[in-house]
Amino acid sequence: MDYSYDEDLDELCPVCGDKVSGYHYGLLTCESCKGFFKRTVQNNKHYTCTESQSCKIDKTQRKRCPFCRFQKCLTVGMRLEAVRADRMRGGRNKFGPMYKRDRALKQQKKAQIRANGFKLETGPPMGVPPPPPPAPDYVLPPSLHGPEPKGLAAGPPAGPLGDFGAPALPMAVPGAHGPLAGYLYPAFPGRAIKSEYPEPYASPPQPGLPYGYPEPFSGGPNVPELILQLLQLEPDEDQVRARILGCLQEPTKSRPDQPAAFGLLCRMADQTFISIVDWARRCMVFKELEVADQMTLLQNCWSELLVFDHIYRQVQHGKEGSILLVTGQEVELTTVATQAGSLLHSLVLRAQELVLQLLALQLDRQEFVCLKFIILFSLDLKFLNNHILVKDAQEKANAALLDYTLCHYPHCGDKFQQLLLCLVEVRALSMQAKEYLYHKHLGNEMPRNNLLIEMLQAKQT
């Protein structure tokens, strides 16, 4: 079923930038992309891209590459399950509550606009992505000039999209064992975990836009209950820093040919991930799942959570010329450029571009905790046992973020979509980081007894 919207708000299709005609298959889109998405799903069409799977999709070029257009549809959040399989007109009416909530908030925003006597300014069309970034060239630690990986093999075709717009990784559901087992329950019976593969991304998010948001309102009744609960679950930064510093000071058996800085950074990431696992264990819904589902979710998103943790630390740091480590140490970008390999430098610069975009979006702590929760549950339901509980968490997280952004940032109606697009870039960054770490692992250059190695060993199965 298609829902109407208020034309006074003059929104643009997130796929191609054309004028939207209503709610179609999960979000506001134009008639052209609505029809294209419906035909593709109902006819089970399979497209190929003759270029690099990063074609520009806008109003004038949307028909040139159906592969990239369909990937863009999925990336921005159009729902496969909303298309009727019987080829009848209309979609499945399962997103009605979200449509109604969105429409009510837009009506409220329009009333505020009219009352205040100013016109809503919208950003440029989201269907016009920037040029694709250069080929991934990055190294993890400073002072490392070893051989750089060449010819990274691409994974299998993209899997179905998760419920938050970010592509869900195609992977088998493992049992209640593996590298995470010892962190989820006391026993540590096994090591084997199933494989997870990277997939191409339809398009990166847009560069930072100077929206000029007002400061968000303080907490209170206007903050969704889910976000308030997540704020209470956030770990204390000082305690995390002290624990990680203590672990880094413990002696370890490092490889004689391994640079000290590289080993420290790997241990730093390892301990940060342990903190993330501890956070996940305390999260509502997640702690109610069986261990197999918990491990499946974490194996899907562990690298994204690590990357997003680093990104938000830089957003808080707020300095373009340096990065802040979890230990509190500040590293100048000029130092990274001169002492790190070209691979690490490239990855750091790409991460900093996302930091600038989130600064322009004025990402706040409430949005950060909600996005982190979204990442945790961003796996397609078919890979999980408890569909009902996870689906409920997905829908509530989406609704909470939508409500919060529209209520606290009424001058930018597309902030919700822009934030979800940023998660696509987070996943792309995490895939590149994993590819590098895996090649370092194959080169026998990773530290021993490292949890990240256990996660990376999924590549070998």
Curated annotation (Swiss-Prot):
What gene does this protein come from?
NR5A1
Q: Where does this protein hold a 1,2-diacyl-sn-glycero-3-phosphocholine?
A: G341, Y436, K440
Q: Where are the zinc fingers (NR C4-type)?
A: 13-33, 49-73
The name of this protein is Steroidogenic factor 1
Task: Relate the outcome reported for changing P129L.
Answer: In SPGF8 and POF7; loss of activity
Tell me which disease this protein is linked to.
Answer: 46,XY sex reversal 3: A condition characterized by male-to-female sex reversal in the presence of a normal 46,XY karyotype.
- Under the GO molecular function aspect, what terms does this record hold? chromatin binding; DNA binding; DNA-binding transcription factor activity, RNA polymerase II-specific; enzyme binding; nuclear receptor activity; phospholipid binding; RNA polymerase II cis-regulatory region sequence-specific DNA binding; RNA polymerase II transcription regulatory region sequence-specific DNA binding
Occurrences of domain NR LBD (ranges) = 222-459
Q: Where is there biased composition of kind Pro residues?
A: 126-136
Do you know which PROSITE patterns this protein is assigned to?
NR_LBD (PS51843), NUCLEAR_REC_DBD_1 (PS00031), NUCLEAR_REC_DBD_2 (PS51030)
Q: Quick one: which residues bind a 1,2-diacylglycero-3-phosphoethanolamine?
A: G341, Y436, K440
Q: Subunit info?
A: Binds DNA as a monomer. Interacts with NR0B2 and PPARGC1A. Part of a complex consisting of SFPQ, NONO and NR5A1. Interacts with NCOA2. Interacts with DGKQ and CDK7. Binds to and activated by HIPK3.
Annotated Gene Ontology cellular components are: chromatin; cytosol; nucleoplasm; nucleus; RNA polymerase II transcription regulator complex
